[in-house]
């Protein structure tokens, strides 16, 4: 996972 995935 990445930070971008957590924001979605």
Curated annotation (Swiss-Prot):
Name of the protein this chain belongs to: Unknown protein 3
